From Swiss-Prot:
Propeptide intervals in chain numbering: 24-101
Lineage, opening ranks: Eukaryota, Metazoa, Chordata, Craniata, Vertebrata
Gene Ontology biological process terms in this record: cellular response to stress; DNA damage response; extrinsic apoptotic signaling pathway via death domain receptors; HRI-mediated signaling; positive regulation of mitophagy; response to iron ion starvation
Organism of origin: Homo sapiens
Keyword Repeat assigned: yes
Function noted in UniProt: Protein kinase activator that acts as a key activator of the integrated stress response (ISR) following various stresses, such as iron deficiency, mitochondrial stress or mitochondrial DNA breaks. Detects impaired protein import and processing in mitochondria, activating the ISR. May also required for the induction of death receptor-mediated apoptosis through the regulation of caspase activation.
Annotated protein name in UniProt: DAP3-binding cell death enhancer 1
Length: 515
């Protein structure tokens, strides 16, 4: 019992103060070893074995010697007792964990099948046999069965070896979910890869079904994969070329707006050389009007033809006009080709082509009154005020439609409201003659005095207002068709017919360069 206080004092020398144990520091005895005042002593019970003889009676020198020796050893307690407690506590925790692992291993059922499936190869086997493996990978061809072939039974022997090679290049602790989240971002996946993915998953589900090998099918599959890769590379190259062409065309339009025609034409030419139809059309405009390059109609026709062959509606319209304007194209096949291109552009919704065909079909040898009304009506509904005015003439004279004077007046009013000067002049003439609400006979007389024939050649003064319309730069000066004897006027006359504007061509290029 007399050793217990010493053990407690040795284990808890710092946490227990003298006030708790009601012990004061031991002072220095004259004949004993000296102790420091900071050393704490635990209470020592009265271990005097003298019994009831009283304090003055001693149990002998041997008994007092053991007590003094123990007190002297207790006063020399080492200050490293906290480190000892931590060390022993750590060892105790490790021992508990070891016992827990031993208990868990002992609870598992024993057997060769369980040991094989619990090996570290099992997660890699499931990974390499899953459809998440890249469909175009060379490893997958040796691991997964082909879509048409059997599921080889030796894949389980080869997969761990391939899995070890792959594990050296990837972190070993990545999860199945992280792989699934990263796979859709693979840029090399295309449509054939998805098709192979479906076949791979179905072959895994039917892995237990035996089948005969088909070497020919595997070769065809490899060939199709090779072709798919080549198609993917070609598509990427075409996309890159298109992006560069769009950038060049955009720079050309920006330079055209800023007035740098030379730089604009240079950018248009670079984009046109890459096969971009919109840049080819813009380059044709520059050649036709001499902006940034000397004026050359033959080169303009060439660029229009290149863009028209790709389905560019504005290029089809301008190329058809050039064919009709060329004296060498007076023979029938070239005219039919020009009319066919104009129809394609008009059917695509191009207002300029619709207006041009509406007037073209009122003149020989293309005279077709019903088709003329059709295209004039389409152009008028697309906002062309001049076509609305021409449609009013057709209703007033019964050209291609049943004669309707009220509809003719409404067409004149709608065209005049859009700023058409010819329609405004026609309305003023009707009002000055007292024809604001005329009878049928009065309006017939007025119409006969004003118009001798609704044909194109008789509309010289009526079509003169076309030169003052905003779309005259694209449709041409239709009022000069009768005086020139053939469709279209010279480029000089067309340029003079365009209303004065700081950059008429630049506005046309910017508006139509991306259309």
């Amino acid at each position: 019992m007399w050793r217990l206080p010493g053990l407690l004092g040795r284990a808890l020398p710092r946490t227990l103060g003298p006030s708790l144990w009601r012990v004061t520091p031991k002072s220095t005895s004259p004949d004993g070893p000296q102790t420091t005042s900071s050393t704490l002593l635990v209470p020592v019970p009265n271990l005097d074995r003298s019994g009831p003889h009283g304090p003055g009676t001693s149990g002998g020198p041997r008994s007092h010697g053991w007590k003094d020796a123990f007190q002297w050893m207790s006063s020399r307690v080492s200050p490293n007792t906290l480190w000892d407690a931590i060390s022993w506590g750590t060892l105790a925790v490790l021992a508990l964990q070891l016992a827990r692992q031993i208990h868990f291993q002992a609870s598992l059922p024993a057997g060769p099948q369980r040991v094989e499936h619990c090996s570290w190869h099992s997660p890699l086997d499931r990974f390499f046999s899953s459809p998440l493996w890249h469909p175009c990978s060379s490893l997958r061809q040796h691991i997964l069965p082909s879509p048409d072939g059997p599921a080889p039974r030796h894949t389980g022997l080869r997969e761990p070896r391939l899995g070890q090679e792959e594990a050296s290049a990837q972190p070993r602790n990545f999860s199945h979910n992280s792989l699934r989240g990263a796979r859709p971002q693979d840029p090399s996946e295309e449509g054939p890869g998805d098709f192979g993915f479906l076949h791979a998953s179905s072959s895994i589900e039917s892995e237990a079904k035996p089948a005969q090998p088909q070497p020919t099918g595997e070769k065809e599959q490899d060939k199709s994969k090779t072709l798919s890769l080549e198609e993917a590379v070609t598509s990427i190259q075409q996309l890159f070329q298109l992006s560069v062409s769009i950038a060049f065309n955009f720079l050309g339009t920006e330079n055209m707006k800023s007035g740098d025609h030379t730089a604009a034409f240079s950018y248009f030419q670079k984009a046109a050389a890459r096969g971009y139809s919109k840049a080819q059309y813009n380059a044709g405009l520059c050649h036709e009007h001499g902006r940034g390059t000397p004026r050359d109609i033959s080169k303009a026709v060439l660029y229009y033809q290149l863009a028209a062959s790709q389905g560019h509606s504005l290029a089809q319209y301008r190329y058809a006009r050039c064919l009709l304007r060329d004296p060498a194209s007076s023979w029938n096949p070239e005219r039919q080709r020009a009319v066919s291109l104009l129809k394609q552009a008009a059917d695509s919704g191009l207002r300029e082509a619709q207006a041009f065909l509406g007037v073209l079909f009122t003149k020989e040898p293309y005279l077709d009154e019903q088709r003329a009304v059709k295209y004039l009506w389409l152009a008028a509904n697309n906002g062309d005020s001049q076509s609305r005015y021409h449609l009013g003439i057709c209703y007033e004279k019964g050209l291609g439609v049943q004669r309707n004077l009220g509809e003719a007046l409404r067409c004149y009013q709608q065209s005049a409201a859009l700023g058409n000067e010819a329609a405004q002049e026609r309305l003023r003439a009707l009002f000055s003659m007292g024809a604001a609400a005329p009878g049928p006979s009065d309006l017939t007389v007025t119409g006969l005095k004003s118009f001798s024939s609704p044909s194109l050649c008789s509309l010289n003064t009526l079509l003169a207002g076309t030169s003052r319309l905003p779309h005259a730069s694209s449709t041409g000066n239709l009022g000069l068709l009768c005086r020139s004897g053939h469709l279209g006027a010279s480029l000089e006359a067309s340029s003079r017919a365009i209303p004065p504007h700081p950059y008429p061509l630049e506005r046309s290029v910017v508006r139509l360069g991306f259309g």
